[in-house]
Amino acid sequence: MKRREFLKTAGIMGGMGLTAPSLLSSCGYDNTLKESDIKDAYQTQLLVVGGGPSGVCAAIAAARMGIKTLLVDSGNCLGGTGTKGLVGPFMTCYDAAGEKMIIKGLFEEVVNQLVERGGALHPKDIRQGTEFTAWISSGHDHCTPFDPEILKIVYEHMCLEAGVKILYNASFVKAVMSGRMIKGAILLTPSGLEKVQADWVIDATGNGCVAADAGAPYVFGDPESKRVQPASLFFRINNVDTDRLVADVVPHLPEFRRVNGVSYRCLHWRVAEAEAAGEWDLARKSVNMFRSVEKDQWVINCSRIHNVDPTNAENLTAAETEGRRQVQELMNFFHKYVPGGENATLMGTGSIMGIRESRHILGDYIMPVQSLIDGIIPDDVVLLAANSIDVHGAQGGPAGGLYMPIKKNMYGLPYRCLVPKDIEGLHITGRCISADSAAAGAVRVMPPAMGLGQASGIAAALCIKNKTTASKVDYTDIRKELTKQNVYLI
């Protein structure tokens, strides 16, 4: 490309909030990229980037309010960590006393549809301290075991029924900007580079990719330790003789380690045997395993990979490779050391890594963990939850981290957490909301992520309808619509 042609291309890209070098490097195109290479493919009122639990609920909530909504995802199904990542079960949706379901709305609809299709056990029937919660004795009351394959179908059905347009195999590349206002996004699809023009955008990528690219400030992990929580590659097994496994665990329950009054440490006695034989080198001393819908099926949350940066392809590749190595070690462990696990079969490993922490996008308000501990319900509450503060050790080895069931019955999550600083026309939702590292450790799990997604979709719809900004939208209107959509608030 001649210098004059390059400058002309760079000027075109600059008008869209892009620069040619950054776009070229993002997409793997050579230096012959022209404006015509970016197809002006879609025009929509709302663009939701990321089809995980939070993005799905954002899209459904907005579409039900009559907003033309496009939901894009880099994969070939909806559900993110719950489907592609095989993460399960859904953590608690009840208050801390275990008496009342408080995360309702779209989350409850999803659960009910799963149960109707034989794809879940209802949380009202699941108690903590049992095989459904890895025998963890607190903070896990009323979890929801589910089948990830049925969950894919339920999410897709609910989106299509609401009128959401879904676009799979569409990876976010760049934000389209006009000053501080986001106007859409460039996607990389099998068709090439495609531009989506949108009146509003919701970042549900988990890693805050859209907000960060648009110029919103953020921190990566915990600013004090300069680390992120470790990642895990989940996997599922079947052909387990669950009766024999349970019979091995129950007599050892009094030996379980107690932290902040919480009893956990499943199969630590079997891990000790494997370690003594030189057949265990994982950075854990016990096994987190959750019985699933079918009696012989279990979800394993035990692999541990430290210092994973999911925004770096090489780093993430190394983590995924190490995760699969650890899965092989764990399968050997089940076959050789766990009663009932001798004939266990590997059903599948997550096609994406279970990432606990990466970017925290910053808003004018950053939710502190102390507000959760104190049970604060803010004036602009959009979701009530009681999920425990669960910060996995980032330092390496089995030690470290923080697990603390909340001392109040519930806490409230404010609308302000969904509003990024310095960027207009954008909401954030899911794991990347404006919260400190420890607070994010509580609300990163799927039920609150779904509730926050529903709130962000409602807020975005109101901003579009009323032609206002995220910071000026009337909270009274948000609350009214949340209540209309069966969200529990007090």
Outline where the language-model segments fall.
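Flavin (FAD/FMN)-binding glycine-rich loop and adjacent Rossmann-like elements that form
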Residues: 106, 125, 137-138, 145-146, ...
